[in-house]
């Protein structure tokens, strides 16, 4: 084919792509559609968003366009919601209409399918309802909200304190030990076992979970989701989700071993056995979400979300204690008054410890570890803050804009536990405290996370005083964004009390 013949073909292809682009952006001209930066043909606003620091980028766009603004990522329409009023109106008032998740094409690489979507990224429908109901009821049956699970956590807290004591007051980074302790709680719930902190396979699993979570953000990921045809290019597809694939491979080995010890005649000892029991009941039902593929994804959901979020919050907590020794001393005084230095903390103590409870909540607010939550999608046309948002629009809920709203919090960008105390020193929780999101897709692990945060945090401060190592500079209180916001690397000294 000569060059002359290629020119008309190129013109036709260009016109076709421009028409497709025009069709996808025509909703921007509809009445009351949220404002936003002008999208480029084909790419939309992909080049306008800094995916390495999305929260900051969204904050700048909010200043230009207001609390409800629009983007177009290639041909995917997106609306970003900022501030308590907009977020609550979308997720609570229109809860049924915003409970869906947008398609995430790259998850096909991990084996996602119509009946194997796990819980967190599952589309809103029968499969999600089935798995949400199963997860909540199984966690409850395994002891969530009861003494049995509380004892698991307090036992693990004792192991964590012993590991801290091994450093004999010398400087160390606490993150790895926090990951191991929180992971063992999840391992007990999902696989009925805990690991020694130096177990090589356990360490490999944790490393992959950490690296896999970083793959939840980034420019290439967003481009491949926005233009999924690019997934057919092996060189591109092979660059994403490498750690998540390796994590699932490791998890498959654990699940295979666990199946060999499962006795169907006995009551389930953990979530995996409960899932296997449901698979037996669902045999012959092609519509069931209880299948081998979904087992690994459900367990992976609980592992990845349940481990890193809680351990990151604890890492923020210890950082803020060494940066604010006056707050640390007040927490320790309350622990001494209510619990003493011998008895292990219990959830029943929390009601008598308003200051410690306020500090933990302020750690969550200030750390702001999941600033953008998880994306939602509208299942029908809705109206938010006077703007019309069409069916099929992806929603980003900027939780950071709620947790650090100047209209709600006295000192939004400072660590200030008094945000959660009234004039009489009683604990209060403002409506704008939404670290677990809100609505039908709010985090199902919230009760477990609250238990872990209280028991691990109080156990550590009961046994140790934490400080900045002598001769080292004061650590930064600024975080690092990679889907989660983690503290900048720091060391501390844990001196036994």
UniProtKB/Swiss-Prot annotation:
- Primary localisation category: endoplasmic reticulum
Give the signal sequence positions: none
Gene3D superfamilies according to UniProt: Cytochrome P450
* Catalytic activity line of the entry: (5Z,8Z,11Z,14Z)-eicosatetraenoate + reduced [NADPH--hemoprotein reductase] + O2 = (8R,9S)-epoxy-(5Z,11Z,14Z)-eicosatrienoate + oxidized [NADPH--hemoprotein reductase] + H2O + H(+); (5Z,8Z,11Z,14Z)-eicosatetraenoate + reduced [NADPH--hemoprotein reductase] + O2 = (11R,12S)-epoxy-(5Z,8Z,14Z)-eicosatrienoate + oxidized [NADPH--hemoprotein reductase] + H2O + H(+); (5Z,8Z,11Z,14Z)-eicosatetraenoate + reduced [NADPH--hemoprotein reductase] + O2 = (14S,15R)-epoxy-(5Z,8Z,11Z)-eicosatrienoate + oxidized [NADPH--hemoprotein reductase] + H2O + H(+); N-(5Z,8Z,11Z,14Z-eicosatetraenoyl)-ethanolamine + reduced [NADPH--hemoprotein reductase] + O2 = N-(8,9-epoxy-5Z,11Z,14Z-eicosatrienoyl)-ethanolamine + oxidized [NADPH--hemoprotein reductase] + H2O + H(+)
Q: What is its EC number?
A: 1.14.14.-
The UniProt entry's GO biological process terms, in alphabetical order, are: arachidonate metabolic process; cholesterol metabolic process; retinol metabolic process; xenobiotic metabolic process
State the pathway, as annotated in the record. Cofactor metabolism; retinol metabolism; Lipid metabolism; fatty acid metabolism; Steroid metabolism; cholesterol metabolism
Name one molecular function that GO assigns to this entry. iron ion binding
Q: Which cofactor does it need?
A: heme
InterPro entries given for it? Cyt_P450, Cyt_P450_CS, Cyt_P450_E_grp-I, Cyt_P450_E_grp-I_CYP2D-like, Cyt_P450_sf, Cytochrome_P450_fam2
**In which compartments does the protein localize?**
Endoplasmic reticulum membrane; Microsome membrane
Give the membrane topology: Peripheral membrane protein
Binding, heme: 443
* Cellular component, GO annotation: cytoplasm; endoplasmic reticulum membrane; intracellular membrane-bounded organelle
Q: Which domain of life is it from?
A: Eukaryota
Q: What class of enzyme is it?
A: oxidoreductase
Do the record's keywords include Translocase? no
Per the similarity annotation, which family is this? Belongs to the cytochrome P450 family.
Per its record, how is this protein called by name?
Cytochrome P450 2D6
Give the species this sequence originates from. Answer: Pan troglodytes (Chimpanzee)
């Amino acid at each position: 084919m000569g060059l002359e013949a290629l020119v008309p073909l190129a013109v036709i292809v260009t016109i076709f792509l421009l028409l497709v682009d025009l069709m996808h952006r025509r909703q921007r001209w509809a009445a009351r559609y949220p404002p936003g930066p002008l999208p480029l043909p084909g790419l939309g606003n992909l080049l306008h968003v800094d995916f390495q620091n999305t929260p900051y980028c969204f904050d700048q766009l909010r200043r230009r366009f207001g609390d409800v603004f629009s983007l177009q990522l290639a041909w995917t329409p997106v609306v970003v919601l900022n501030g308590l009023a907009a977020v609550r109106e979308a997720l609570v008032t229109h809860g049924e209409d915003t409970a869906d998740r947008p398609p995430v094409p790259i998850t096909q690489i991990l084996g996602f399918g119509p009946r194997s979507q796990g819980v967190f990224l599952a589309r809103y429908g029968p499969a999600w309802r089935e798995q949400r109901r199963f997860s909540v009821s199984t966690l409850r049956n395994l002891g969530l909200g009861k003494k049995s699970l509380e004892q698991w956590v307090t036992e693990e807290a004792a192991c964590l304190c012993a590991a801290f004591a091994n450093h004999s007051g010398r400087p160390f980074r606490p993150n790895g030990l926090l990951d191991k302790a929180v992971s063992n709680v999840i391992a007990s719930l999902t696989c009925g076992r805990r690991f020694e902190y130096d177990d090589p396979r356990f360490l490999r699993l944790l490393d992959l979970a950490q690296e896999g979570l970083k793959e939840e953000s980034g420019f290439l990921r967003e481009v491949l989701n926005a233009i999924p045809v690019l997934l057919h290019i092996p060189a591109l597809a092979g660059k994403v989700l490498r750690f998540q694939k390796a994590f699932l491979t490791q998890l498959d080995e654990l699940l295979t071993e666990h199946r060999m010890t499962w006795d169907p005649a006995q009551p389930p000892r953990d979530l995996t056995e409960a899932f296997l029991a449901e698979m037996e009941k669902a045999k012959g039902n092609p519509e069931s979400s209880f299948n081998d593929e979904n087992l690994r994804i459900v367990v992976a959901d609980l592992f990845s979300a349940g481990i890193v979020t809680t351990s990151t919050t604890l890492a923020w907590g210890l950082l803020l204690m060494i940066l604010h020794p006056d707050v640390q001393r007040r927490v320790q005084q309350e622990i001494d008054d209510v619990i003493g230095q011998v008895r292990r903390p219990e959830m029943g103590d929390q009601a008598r410890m308003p200051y410690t409870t306020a500090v933990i909540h302020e750690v969550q607010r200030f750390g702001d570890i999941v600033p953008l939550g998880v994306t939602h999608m509208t299942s029908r046309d809705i109206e938010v803050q006077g703007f019309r948002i069409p069916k099929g629009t992806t929603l980003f809920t900027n939780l950071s804009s709620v947790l650090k709203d100047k209209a709600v919090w006295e000192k939004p960008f400072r660590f200030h536990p008094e945000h959660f105390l009234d004039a009489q020193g009683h604990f209060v929780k403002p409506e704008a405290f939404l670290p677990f999101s809100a609505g039908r897709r709010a985090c199902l692990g919230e009760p477990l996370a609250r238990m872990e945060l209280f028991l691990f945090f109080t156990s550590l401060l009961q046994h140790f005083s934490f400080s900045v190592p002598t001769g080292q500079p004061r650590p930064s209180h600024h975080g690092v964004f990679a889907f989660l916001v983690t503290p900048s690397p720091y060391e501390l000294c844990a001196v036994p009390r």
